[in-house]
Amino acid sequence: IMSGHTHWNQSFESNNVFHHIHGAICGAWWGGETSFDGAPLGYAVYEIKNDSISWYFQSAGKDRNHQMQLTYVDSIGSVVANVWNWDAKWKVELIADGKEMGEMTRYIGYSPVMADYYNSLPPGSPWMKPVLTAHLFKMSIDKNVKRVSVRVTDRFGRVYNESISIK
């Protein structure tokens, strides 16, 4: 099932039926470059070959491999990965200074990027409020780590990588 007209993205499977909720291409009401869940402006691409279907999220103006955003949240000493097309068959792993650290922990929360954006707006902008999302992952890292990479493997075996420098 594919649905839309929300301003956030969500994917889940229930009773053997896969449901895609696609965010509006305008993101958070044309109010910036993200949706309420922190996902970039973009759209879903479905590829059908014979009796198989696969899909990915295409961020507007970005390469096809742009499937996540990494943020270091100093207040909790953790790296947060927002993997906007995530579903339960994906794997999200962290590498700190070249060392494999294992799978990140999924949690429900607000995108750090969208929360910061909302907090920077003038009072009275309630329609830009971020929404809780379940496609966030976090892992605490040692305070001496300089570079972090996150490797995401989707349900089709495609691998995506993003890296950030810490301080």
Predicted regions mapped to residue ranges:
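Conserved beta-sheet core of the metallophosphoesterase superfamily
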Residues: 1-72, 91, 100-102, 118-120
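Long, low-complexity serine/threonine/glycine- and acidic-rich segments characteristic of extracellular
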Residues: 66-167
